[in-house]
Structure formats: C-alpha cells, structure tokens
C-alpha cells in the first residue's frame, strides 16, 4: 500500500502536537530498566522470534509486540513505546487489547509511528494477477479479472488508495411488491448469476420533480439482499425484508409505528432506487464485482489505469484493533499516534440481516426485530430499553476503557464506522486526526443500550473529540454521521472541521421520540455535553431531515448542566432540516453565539414537554440567544423557550470576526487540511445522485445532488446528457450550486427524454461515471404561471431583512417554480430593488415549507414595501406582499 510523504509529514506534525510530552517519552530498549521506560520495535520485515529490543531485532506483528509489552508493563515507572516502522501491517486477526495491555502506575503504552515512518494497519487482502478476461462491457471496455481467496467476505475494494465502486445500476425490470419480495415484468434477472450477492437499495432524501424517493424515512438508505430469483419471482432475504416492510403500527389512531421513528415500510411503493453487486451490472470504469464463491474479482479499469501493476486491496477484516474491558477492570492508558487504519469491512449488510435502518447507522435485526426490538413498554414482548437497536460496529473499537487516546492518526478506506468508543468509555481523547472515505459513521461515542447505567464503570463520560478533520464519510451507508454520540456525559466536541457529508455532521442524544405520542422522553444520564467552535459546511448533501448539529432526547436536569452548543460556524447545509436541529425530546439545551448562513433553515424547533409533572402545555426548555443567522426569528419568551438577542446577517462578514475565525481547526492543526488519503492514482469523483427532470417548451430542466465524495479530485463542472439524441450541456460547479438546475435546450416537443449527469474535474480523463437516469419527461408548451407564494412576512435586522414565504402552488403538469423574485420598494425614494433567490430550497420546497432569504445593504430608518413572486419556465407569477417594514 502506498502513502504520500506529504500526508505523513502533516500527520506527524499533528501527532506531535496532540501527543505533547507523551510523544517524547523515553525510548530505551525493551530490555532496559523499566524506570526509564522502554521501546518495543516492530517492522513488517521483522521476526516474531526476535526480542524487539532495537530496530535490528524488530518483531514482525502487532500481536507479538503485545506479548512483549505484557512482559514489561506490570510495574511501569515510565511510558512504554511500541514503535512501528514504515510499511503495512496486515491484520489476519485483530489486535485485541484488554486490561492486561494497559499502562500502569500513571504511565501509558504508546503505539506510535517511528520517526518519519508511515505505518498502515491494514485489514486488507491484496489481489494480484489481473489480466484481460476477454470479455467487454456493452460499451466495449475491457473487463479485467484476477484470482481472489474463495469464500472470503468483502464489500469494498481499493486500488492505489482510491475506492472502487461496486457494480450497480438502475433496476432493469419493472417490479411489483409482494409479501415476500417482488414480481418482475420479465425473467431477465433469473438468468443472472449469484442472486444472493445482489442487493436492492432504497434511497431516502427529498423527492421533487420527476424524482420519487423512498427509504425508511428521508434520513435513511436501507438495503436488503435477494434470497432467490425464479422466473419473474424475486424473493428477498429474511429477516431484512420483513424488518423493512412490516414494522408494527400503533393502534391509537396516531398513524405512527410503535418504534415512533419512521414509517412501517420502505417508501415509493417499496420500489428500490437501484440494484447493486451483480456481475451483469459491470459497465462503468471504476466498477468491480467480487465473486466470493468462484474466488475471482472482475474490474473495469479507469482510463490509463493498469490493474496488473496496481496495489489492489479487498477489505476483509471487520476489526483491526479492539479494546475490551469490564466495568470493574477497564482497559486503560493506551495511546495511538501517527498511525493509519485502513481496509476494514462489515459483513452484516451482506447477510440476510441486510441494513434495515432506523437512524444514524442503527438497524433492526433478528427474526422478530420489526415487532419487538427496542419497543419495550410500547408493545407486549418488546425488548428494553426503548430505542435499543443494533449499532453499526467500528473497524477500530473500544468499550469499558479509560484514557485511550488517538492523536495524529488517519482513519480511511474503512467499511464500517471508523472509530467506536462504546459503553463505558471514559476520559478518552480523539485529537488531530483525519477521518475520510469511511463507509459508515466517522466516530461513534457511547451507545443507546443503557440509558441509566447503574454502575460507574458503565457510564460514558469525560471524552474529548477535538481538532479533527472529518470529511467525505458515510460513502456507502449514506445515512451515517460524522460524529455520533448516544447517551454520554461531559463530552467535549470542539474545534473540528466537518464537511462534505451525505447526512448529519454531528448527532447527539437518543430516546426523545415518545413525545410524538405525548409520552415522556426516555430518562437517561446524559448531561454536561458541549459542542463548541466547530466549522461545519456542505453537510446534508444527499439525505434529508437532519442537520449540521442534530440533537434529541433529554440532555440534563437543567439548563445549567444541559447541552451547550456555542461558537459553531455552520453554512451551506443543503437538504431540508435545520442547521441546529432540536428534534424530539431535546430538553435543557443552550444555543448561543453560533454563526449560520446559506442554510435551508437555521434552527428548529420546540417540542412539547411530557416529562412529569409537565403535561405538554409547555415545551422542552431551550435557550437560544446571541446567534448570528439568517432565519431571523423574533424575540420571544414563552412555554419555557427563550429566543432573544439574535442578529440577522447577510453572510459571515456581518458576524464578529473573532467568532468566525475561531471555529474549526485551531491554527496548529490546520496542516490536517492537506491530508487527503483518497488522492490515489487514477481516482475519479463519485457520480452525482438523485437526478430529477422537469419539462419545458423545447427544453428540460435537470437538477441533482452534487458530488460530496470527490476522492481528491475536486469537481469543477457537471455535464448533463439527454437521451435520445445525446444533447449535452456543461455547467461549471459554482454556477450550478447557485441555481441548482441545468437548462437543456434544443429538445423536441412530444419526445420523451431521460437525463444522466457526470461530475467533471480539471482533467478530461477524470470524470465520474454517469448518474442513474432520471425518469422520462416530455417537453411541450408551458403557459401556466405559478401562483403567488403564501404566508409572506419579513423580520427586520440592522440594515438587513429576512423575508419568509411558503412556496407557490404549481398546477399539475406545468413547470415547477425555479426561483423567487424578492422586490423591495423604498417608500422614501421610490427605488426598487429585486433580488432573485435560487438554489436547492427554491427548486425543491413545496408549499408546506417555510423558505427565507436575507436582503442586506438597506438604509437605516427607511421603510420598504416587500413582495415575493415565483418564477417558472412560463415566467413570473403574481406577487405576494410581505408588508412594509422599517429598517433598524
């Protein structure tokens, strides 16, 4: 495995800063007087029969180094360093640590890179011997093949440091859902090989225009394997299918499931968005298919790629490093510094359990999971506690541990969550590290299986996640989050930069959903958690109903010890939700001095308080003050919710410079921004997603979600291609992000068209594969104008006004709204200013969604009459009045 020196230098600096004096511990040999500490030397070219006493006598494996450490650490009077030389350490078995591997007498066992080294702890199996198979794709591209170990489970493959894509595509037949799966319109899929390898994917997110979405809620993307295909009958794997389509409904007329989180079944009439992992789908460069039964990998190379000479890794180990203690005997005082963890996988989604999702990587599992798991007091036979669903594992995981630290490390090319610090994790530190190209969550902290631990050692308390760069995570299980926290106490999440995530950036809390049925949120031990000074942008790039910071459940016993969210800078959160999202049961939260702009919504929202003695007549206590935002909520103090002294801004230039500059990585950690392990040779960006189309006269409008996973190849433009005819329109990326649609002219009225989109880079050879095609739309005359927006209003700031409206109703079969004209007429001078508001919200939002825009640079003391009008392909519709306001 190759790793650039630039990456290693940046990480080495971060590791040294984060580790502080710990990294400078004494480094005498393993056999030296333990009063001065000791060093155990490890090298991929070492010998496990050797002593590890010096570099010339290095041991080979981490497990042998572990044995040497155990022989030294019973009476430590100095730190023990396990120094890893340059190279790759293949983990056929995980490094499994327990209390015997702990530091003692106040000292630490430090697993660290040797000076200048770039060690990689790998769960991969290298694949070599690629050769042309003699077969080609439908476009004539050569398929290459190589032998691989038969029966070895894997879902991910990496080539020269970049992630290959599993073979996937549109479902090639029309499906009708049945109790056990589907009836297909033809027997085409019955001829496909290895049907049990195939998965259907059900994408959530926001549906609009021609796009219909499903999932188990807009925040999810479940997937289920196929069990068999016979003729036109497709039988889905159990229990995934029943857990995803038969979730039990309440009988109280609430229309809710017993789990209170999402719907009873996958949406969009239970139709999958795409199909994945069949050799017959192998079409696009960069795609692979691993036939575990035959022991073969098939791959379509990217332009210029030479598989025979590439470093190809199948991710095969589920756990690389684990630390497991008990409440009475925790594993403790162990540090990891300057290491890279790569090539882990996770096998549950490939099993009959599939990925039957609830939220944030938690799934329902087991034969009766849909009817019992985590349903506790709400259904007979429900297991306790409420909300205890199956947690996504971490490829690096600890539980019942104390003072574990990860500093200056890289978590990348992983197939589950990156790092899981589970129940009983106490006073751990994650600092100065990089998390990217991870299939699931970046960092997991705590769990949801023990809301009120009875034993001190079971509490998750005092952990710090600071100064990390977390980006392009959740690239396979795209409902994942950058940092996910369950029930935890006195947590500090500060000075991280989190960007380019498909769903929520930070999620904290659990168990608030019972307020949907006027029942109290689940009592839990959480308190004293702080989320401060983080820089979060370009989150929510794919799914919806989340936020930059998503919270739920009880967070303390008062505002004094409840959750504190302060000093965060949050911008360009794409899909619908809230930049700071107080979801069900969010109680005792203080939200102050945050800077928020270019978001669909900045903050929301209060919920009824049903924790006794409250009866829902008041809300969960919240304090929202001194924020700088564009939403512009008026000051209020009612029902236990205070909203006060917040400032409307036009952008970051209107917020205090000290707040804006302080957010994100502190200066000494900003070298992490140059670390991108995804910049492998030949990498290309992931394809755009969720393409939707709307017809105009002789034209069509095409919208799509932008690429959030560019594999180190920044997207500079997007190309839309029409079929039939091949008409193409290319638009640069910044222009697209402003309007969120591409106009494709020169089409023939009365002809049905579909459209695909590619993400382009500065190099013509590095464009992505095309997106899935849109549904067909038929151009034709468009004459109907949109109606006037509803509920227009304005909130006044200092030189700014936040104008709100509900989107216009659009007649069926006519063009949807594409933008909005906000017009201000100065009542003193008669000057008229019109600002055209464009973007994802304006394109997507329906008439039930509050939409807003800020207009800046207005004259103090002047009165302005404000109107809002929708614009579609036919022109500008009638305006709605937002009233006359005087600028402060």
Task: Label every model-predicted segment.
Residues 41-400, 405, 451-455, 678-681:
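Extracellular polysaccharide-degrading/modifying enzymes targeting complex plant/algal/animal polysaccharides
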Residues 93-94, 318, 345-351, 393, ...:
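Short glycine/acidic-rich loop motifs that flank beta-strands on beta-rich extracellular proteins
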Residues 165, 171, 343, 347, ...:
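Extracellular beta-rich repeat passengers
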Residues 332-343, 382-384, 402-416, 425-440, ...:
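Right-handed parallel beta-helix
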Residues 680-714, 749, 765-816, 860, ...:
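Pro/Thr/Ser/Gly-rich low-complexity, intrinsically disordered linker/stalk tracts
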Residues 717-748, 763, 821-859:
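Recognizes extended acidic, P/S/T-rich segments that occur
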Residues 744-765, 855-874:
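Beta-strand-rich modules
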């Amino acid at each position: 495995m190759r790793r650039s020196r630039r990456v290693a230098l940046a990480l080495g600096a971060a590791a040294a800063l984060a580790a502080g004096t710990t990294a400078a511990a004494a480094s005498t040999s393993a056999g030296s007087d333990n009063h001065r500490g000791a060093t155990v030397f490890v090298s991929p070219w070492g010998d496990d029969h050797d002593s590890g006493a010096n570099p010339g006598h290095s041991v080979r494996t981490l497990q042998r180094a572990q044995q040497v450490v155990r022989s030294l650490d019973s009476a430590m009077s100095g730190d023990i360093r396990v120094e890893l030389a340059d190279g790759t350490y293949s983990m056929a078995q995980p490094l499994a640590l327990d209390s015997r591997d702990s530091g003692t007498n106040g000292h630490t066992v430090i697993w660290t890179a040797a000076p200048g080294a770039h060690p990689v702890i790998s769960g991969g199996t290298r694949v070599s011997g690629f050769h042309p198979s003699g077969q080609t794709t439908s476009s004539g591209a050569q398929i290459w093949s190589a032998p691989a170990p038969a029966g070895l489970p894997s879902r991910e493959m990496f080539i020269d440091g970049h992630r290959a894509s599993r073979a996937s595509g549109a479902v090639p037949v029309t499906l009708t859902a049945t109790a056990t799966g589907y009836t297909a319109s033809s027997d085409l899929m019955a001829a496909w090989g290895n049907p049990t390898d195939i998965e259907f994917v059900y994408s959530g997110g926001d549906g609009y225009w021609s796009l219909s979405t499903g999932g188990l809620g807009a925040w999810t993307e479940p997937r289920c394997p196929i069990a068999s295909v016979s003729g036109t009958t497709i039988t889905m794997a159990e229990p995934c299918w029943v857990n995803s389509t038969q979730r039990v409904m309440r009988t109280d007329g609430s229309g809710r499931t017993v789990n209170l989180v999402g719907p009873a079944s996958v949406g969009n009439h239970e139709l999958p968005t795409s199909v994945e992992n069949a050799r017959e789908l192998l079409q696009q460069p960069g795609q692979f298919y691993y036939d575990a039964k035959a022991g073969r990998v098939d791959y379509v190379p990217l332009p210029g790629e030479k598989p025979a000479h590439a470093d190809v890794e199948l991710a095969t180990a589920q756990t690389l490093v684990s630390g497991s203690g008990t409440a009475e005997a925790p594993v403790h005082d162990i540090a990891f510094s300057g290491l890279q963890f790569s090539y882990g996988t996770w096998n549950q989604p490939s099993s009959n359990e599939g990925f039957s999702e609830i939220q944030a990587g938690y799934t329902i599992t087991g034969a009766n999971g849909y009817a019992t798991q985590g349903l506790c007091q709400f259904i007979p036979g429900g297991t306790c506690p409420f909300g205890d669903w199956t947690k996504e594992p971490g490829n690096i995981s600890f539980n019942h541990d104390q003072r574990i630290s990860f500093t200056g490390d890289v978590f990348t090319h992983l197939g589950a969550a990156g790092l899981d610090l589970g129940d009983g994790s106490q006073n751990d530190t994650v600092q100065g590290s990089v998390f990217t190209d991870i299939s699931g969550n970046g960092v997991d902290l705590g769990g949801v299986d023990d809301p009120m631990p009875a034993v001190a050692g079971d509490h998750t308390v005092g952990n710090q996640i600071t100064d990390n760069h977390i980006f392009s995570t959740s690239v396979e299980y795209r409902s994942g989050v950058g940092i996910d926290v369950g029930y935890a106490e006195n947590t500090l999440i500060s000075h991280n930069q989190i960007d380019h995530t498909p769903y929520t950036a930070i999620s904290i809390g659990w168990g608030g959903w019972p307020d949907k049925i006027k029942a109290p949120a689940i009592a839990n031990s959480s308190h004293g958690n702080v989320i401060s000074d983080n820089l979060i942008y370009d989150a929510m790039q794919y799914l919806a109903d989340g936020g930059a910071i998503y919270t739920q459940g009880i967070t303390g016993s008062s505002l004094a010890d409840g959750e504190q969210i302060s000093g965060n800078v949050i911008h360009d959160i794409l899909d619908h939700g809230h930049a700071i999202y107080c979801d069900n049961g969010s109680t005792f939260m203080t939200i102050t001095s945050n800077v928020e702009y270019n978001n669909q919504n900045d903050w929301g929202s209060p919920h009824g308080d049903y924790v006794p003695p409250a009866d829902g007549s008041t809300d969960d206590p919240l304090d929202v003050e001194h924020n700088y935002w564009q939403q512009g909520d008026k000051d209020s103090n009612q029902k236990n919710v205070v909203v006060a002294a917040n400032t409307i801004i036009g952008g970051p230039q209107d917020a205090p410079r000290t707040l804006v500059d302080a957010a994100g990585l502190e200066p000494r950690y900003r070298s992490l921004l140059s670390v991108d392990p995804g910049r492998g040779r030949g990498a290309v960006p992931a394809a755009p997603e969720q393409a939707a189309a709307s017809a105009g006269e002789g034209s069509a409008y095409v919208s799509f979600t932008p690429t959030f996973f560019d594999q180190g190849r920044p997207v500079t433009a997007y190309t839309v291609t029409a079929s039939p005819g091949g008409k193409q329109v290319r638009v640069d990326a910044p222009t697209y992000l402003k309007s969120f649609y591409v106009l494709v002219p020169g089409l023939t009225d009365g002809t049905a068209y579909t459209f695909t989109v590619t993400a382009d880079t500065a190099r013509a050879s590095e464009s992505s594969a095309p997106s899935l095609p849109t549904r067909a739309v038929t151009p034709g005359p468009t004459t109907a104008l949109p109606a006037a927006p509803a509920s227009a209003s304005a909130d006044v700031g200092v030189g700014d006004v936040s104008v709100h409206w509900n989107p216009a109703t659009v007649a069926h079969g006519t063009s949807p709204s594409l933008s909005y004209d906000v017009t201000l007429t100065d009542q003193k001078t008669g000057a008229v200013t019109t600002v055209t508001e464009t973007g994802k919200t304006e394109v997507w939002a329906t008439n039930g969604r509050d939409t807003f825009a800020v207009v800046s640079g207005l004259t103090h003391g002047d009165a302005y009459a404000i109107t809002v009008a929708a614009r579609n392909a036919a022109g500008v519709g009638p305006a709605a009045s937002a009233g006359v306001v005087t600028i402060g």
